[in-house]
Amino acid sequence: MIRSKGFTLTELLIVLALAAILATLAAPNFRDFVRSTRMTSEANSLLLGLNLARSESVKRGQRITLSSTSTNTSWTEGWDMYDDTGVAGTKDGTDATIRVGEAIDPPLTMTGAANVVGYQPSGVLAPVPAVFTFDLCESDRNGETGRQITISVTGRVSIADFLCP
């Protein structure tokens, strides 16, 4: 008798059914993983920009400012980093752009304590508030975990998880 090698239709259907069940169980976790990774990526992008601004202010010996491209405290549309040689906190004709931060894709939103943050030549915040925070959240997931980027008085930047409002 000749034995054929391969799978029967029944065996194939059972394997496909098991694969479908496993995929449905893994899909929500994968979606959360993608959201979390995207949020972490955006937070790290701002963190790098803030650290660059701090190091440039020390290196150049002048004030370096980051300002939101919108006129309010929303940083979702992106930001500009420039050497602030003119009017402090205002980008004018004498200020050269150092770096531009990209806009954040929805549903992520980023708000800051103000629309301008700067570093003095010593590397500390200018003007000196107690702390400066950015809140990174998903607009369609209130009460979920987001990222909070905090700048201390000394200019040190840190990222922590927090509950979005």
Task: Kindly give the residue locations of the regions a language model identified.
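N-terminal helix-rich module
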Residues: 2, 21, 25-55, 59, ...
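Glycine-centered recognition micro-motifs in short, flexible terminal segments and loops
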Residues: 1-25
